[in-house]
Amino acid sequence: MNASSPDKILIKKYELFITEDKYISQKELGSFLKENSNLIKKIKNNIYYSNDIFKALDIINNIENYVRTHNKVFIKRKLIEEKKYFDRMFEKIDKNINLDVEQRIAILTEEDYSMIIAGAGSGKTTTMAAKVKYLVERLNVNPEEIMLISYTNKAVDELKERINNDFKIPVKVSTFHKFGLDILKKKSDEPIKVLTNSYSIIAEYFNKELCHDNDKLKEFLYFFIYYFDIPTSALKFDSLDEYHKFKRRNDYITLKSRLGDYNKEIIDNRTKNKYTIRGEFLRSSEEVMIANYLYIHNVEYDYEKPYPYMNRGKIYLPDFTIYFGEKTYYLEHYGIGQKNGNNRYNAVENWWYRKGIAYKSRLHDKHKTKLMTTYSSYDDGDDLISHLRQELEKNGIILRKKDEKEIFKQLSETSKDTYYMRFILFCMEFLNSFKSKGFKLVAFDNLIDQHKDDQRTVMFLKFAKDLYQYYEKELKINNLIDFNDMINNSYDLLKNIEKGQIDLNYKYIIIDEYQDISIQRFNLTKEVSRLSDAKVIAVGDDWQAVFAFAGSDVTLFTEFKKLMGYGEELQITNTYRNSQELIDIAGRFVMRNSKQIKKRLKAQKSLPKPVVIVNYDDNEEKTFSRAYAVDECIKNIVMEYGDKSSILLIGRYNFDKYHLLNSNLFYEYEQDKIKSLNFPNVKITFLTAHSSKGLGFDNVIIINGSEGIYGFPSQIQNDPIMDIIAVKDNSFKFAEERRLFYVALTRTKNKVYIITPNNNPSSFLTELKDYPNVEIVFGTKKNFGQREDLCPACNHPLIRKSFNSLNIRNLYECSNEKELCDFKTNNLILKKKIEVCSECKDGFLVIKQNAESKKYFLGCTNYKKDKSGCNNAKTIF
């Protein structure tokens, strides 16, 4: 074959290509194949036997493998050639910083899309700074062609300090929002004004737009009064036990309470002390709907007032006692379908529920009292409110509706700091989340169509659509954009233009904390990369992805290569903060979720038992007991590490701090700077788990290790309305909370203490307690994890009802449906059931203690010391 034959030409070009002293990226490989596509086609179509043709075909078929091998050899050689350069890179700044091999490989890798997975305490900022320095000094990249992006101003300042100040390299470091704003400025002839707080426009909508439009006001009030509280039917529970626990920790408060119209003076049946109730607390959101309807229509009622006729000593509390004229009516609401029962209950439980309904019906028939009934659902498709209205009108109760404008006025004036404000904040949160996903107006109609069978969601979406249109109109009129627009509008601008139509002179886009990226930021990054041919370097750790509530989507990190089309995944596994024992515990814990990227972090130091679970007695004086346990941990730290050791107190929520401050063992002398009265020289900082991310302290105390709605893991349920637009990680139970707990565990350089109540420990701790190198103090593994107080009759949680229609302080009642279990007690130790007094008929037999003998007995609440009351008493065996 002659020298100009296709095979020889391809071989020569390939040898020049593969022997270049550089890392070959996929784009460069693609360009090579595209430039030589005609040669490749000729070779494939004109096969003949020769050594050159076999060699050319081998190149065509295996060029990707050869490029990978070339890159590995190149990096291996560069590690040797650049060793002295890397060794000395930080010597003028900090002689203790020495880049490890994984960091150096990450710096030398020049793939188009690279993901650097940097474990906690592995020197992520150091790696990014070193990468920039290498690009500028070794690859002669102009600093103006490098864009470094992080998420917070604090993180931006840290990168600027390291790169701009220490290395004297003038690369641009920016937040995503500032980056988007700068892009918009390139195509704007006028100054761009940014709205920093959406509250002013949204509040204006309520105060001006809403109250002057009768139809809109009517629709708003209907939703607000009857549907703002989340119906339990809209929530998902893994078990019936979880459902009852949810009911236990939620207060269902009526509109009458919220408007200040509920104010009752009560005399405690047992102690005879007088107290005032200013809140009407119901059992369910459906009961709140009924109470609100009665209140709005001027129907007088009492909630759970004892039925006047005794039946074999059983206490019967009808849901509503209704008064109209001289007549008294009773209304029972049943939390099942009129015919179909409730799918939360099994067949036996539904049978017992029906039996309870029949019993109440017979009781009212026997005493000739009028009973009305409502159900959670009906076969005719009408809602609860429609059937309630029919029941009331059928029984001759006249409904006189309050004026809607008066209700709204009273609502906005009396609830500015509570319920009404909560709804405005909910609207702000919804619109922010809606826009952060890049949704436009048309998305409302799509969402309404998707959820057309959910009346509550549809009502809110229609309201939110009108609010969104008003909000966007006000932005436009005032020439404003909000923070979401900085990113959304810049993406919209870029996706409609071609290369060369905008000045985006970037060769590298380096993104810090990439695990926190949202879809709108991802889309913007891809468009900038498309228009500038910039390489994208994503740096982060999926184990620390904890900002889903702000729109972050961890799958954009874990599926980086798939979403980009290809890429290189690199790991930095040496951690310089934690001990090997601690990262083994934390790593095992977070990798219980198989969707997390597998990695084995390596530490330079060893410390036996770095995780200490500290139990405290939560039976009495919980606040002091918890604070005392924290103080004991500080004492141990001082004894082991001295009083110069820095201590971080981590809470799940900011209010965890106040549980400590209320104990009088601690005080706050500056924002989040805490002093212990017993150890005043110790430097103590308080941060939430989210705020602690990225920081390191000598020792850490996690002060909230409890189970519950505000525990760790947090069990706050999102409103289902938010869930339709929220990013949810359902890969594992409490997936994000598990990652957040990992963040909290890894803030320490030495030990982490976790404070937990002995009777209600976090489920995370019941898991950790069996791990190697986890120590438990002030308790034992045997008694660790006693559960909450349960009903002795049905085993569901007991709810404390300080204010109740029986006028018994500290009453505990079963959280189960009344039709299934009516257990009530006033003593959690003995758990004897309260019953109607058989002697006086209007008192109740409750647990009392003899002042002299200290023995317990059942005594009537109508007892009086002068013997003028009821003296009925029973011995407790």
Per-region residue spans from a language model:
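Conserved RecA-like helicase ATPase core segment
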Residues: V348, G356, S361-R362, F522-I613
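Short beta-strand-loop-alpha-helix junction that forms the active-site gateway
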Residues: L317-I357, D454, R530, D542-Q544
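Helicase P-loop NTPase motor core
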Residues: I116, S122-M128, N273, Y566-G567, ...
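Conserved helicase C-terminal RecA-like lobe
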Residues: Y243-R249, G642-S646, N681-V682, L687, ...
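Conserved P-loop NTPase-based nucleic-acid remodeling module centered on helicase motor cores
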Residues: K8, K12-K22, K27, E145, ...
